[in-house]
Amino acid sequence: MLDIKLIRKAPEECETRLRKKDPLISLQPILDLDKEIRHLKTETEALQSQRKLLSNQIHKAKAQGEDVSSMMDNVERISQDLAKLEPLLEQKESTLQDMLVRLPNYPDEDVPVCPDKTGNQVIKQVGALPTFSFTPKHHVELNQKLQILDFKLPAKTSGSGWPAYKNQGVCLEWALLTYLLNKQREHGFQLWLPPLLVKHEILFGSGQIPKFDGQYYRVEDGEQSLYLIPTAEVVLNGFHSQEIFSEKDLPIYYAAFTPCFRREAGAAGAHERGLVRVHQFHKVEMFAFTTPDQADQAYEKMLAVVEDILTELQLPYRLSLLSTGDMSFTASKTIDAEVWLPGQQSYYEVSSISQCTDFQSRRSETRYKDNRGKMHFVHTLNGSGLATPRLFVAILENNQQEDGSVIIPEVLRPYLENQEVLLP
């Protein structure tokens, strides 16, 4: 959420920055409503002050046996006026709050301005693309011999976009996840296995709703609704909502393994069949709480973790700085790590590392007290470390052999009893 004080102070600058993400944004309705609210507040507070003063005068006059009927009439009139003004003020403040929470975060100055992903800038490319003496297969075709995934049986129980791992596929998936968690621990992240269901206000705090309400799976639980998390970012951010850190305790680095659930996956085309876009998947998520001065270092740390993993897995990858039109609602800056998938003949995102400044912490009311005792909102950062479906696909497609077997990356073999090859 954005700071209304900054919008008041520099409305044109704020609007210019926001329009880099959404050219249709206008701050004038917010400014007009804010001005009206401040006028109503002044009027309301003046009446409340008058009523309090009169009440004190009535109390003293009664003690002296004086007639207070005129003052009582004035108190009644003021109370009637307040009975109209106070609900109106509350309603307008609620409307302003709703308008503010629908504004995206400001993009950083170095973020390329473009309405869509065509403006993304490749800032680094690592590893040569694999060459094959045969026509490489898509992972769905490889699976016909390997039998490590099943798409038909889960479709009977859950619909399309809900694949199942089986046989050696289960072992490879868990080897990958164990390896990822070990890498997070090596880099100093605290590990978590958090809840998969969260309250409405926790989704709000991370910036997922109200703008994207309806895109998440909801579970009715008596009087309240709970939501299946789209990413562990939601719950990790929510762990410290309405809390105050001491500056000396920052930065804090968390990493969590969870299944993730997303409704929009069904929009995939035929070229994205299989594991490329699904409703449920496994992901290790990194999250950090920092001071503003620590945020850049935390960003570099997360990026280093991702590059370390992709390098050890020996997968060709690139880093892309996302344009304003391809960034998330909450991010001020995002770099995507993308691996090469021969079956798609394209790079696909396996990690997004985002700085969110104080955008989420204002919604979650997560602050810290500096060494002088002054309160500030923390900065938050998040990044996939990593999501496994496309990583799984990348391992299969980049390491496939002509006979349909797949060479297992060396760093995963200790988790697979030193198995070197997936055999059909």
Swiss-Prot record:
One Pfam family cited in the UniProt record for this chain: tRNA-synt_2b
Compartmental location: Cytoplasm
Statement: the UniProt record of this protein carries the keyword Aminoacyl-tRNA synthetase: yes
BP GO annotations: selenocysteine biosynthetic process; seryl-tRNA aminoacylation
Alphabetized GO MF terms: ATP binding; serine-tRNA ligase activity
Top EC category: ligase
Domain notes: Consists of two distinct domains, a catalytic core and a N-terminal extension that is involved in tRNA binding.
Subunit organization: Homodimer. The tRNA molecule binds across the dimer.
Protein name (Swiss-Prot/TrEMBL): Serine--tRNA ligase
Organism from which the protein derives: Chlamydia abortus (strain DSM 27085 / S26/3) (Chlamydophila abortus)
